[in-house]
């Protein structure tokens, strides 16, 4: 999962 940037 990608970090919410």
UniProtKB/Swiss-Prot annotation:
Highest taxon in the source lineage: Eukaryota
* Tissue expr: Main peptide from the subesophageal ganglia.
- Which protein is depicted? Subesophageal ganglion pentapeptide
- Record organism: Acheta domesticus (House cricket)
């Amino acid at each position: 999962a990608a970090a919410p940037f």
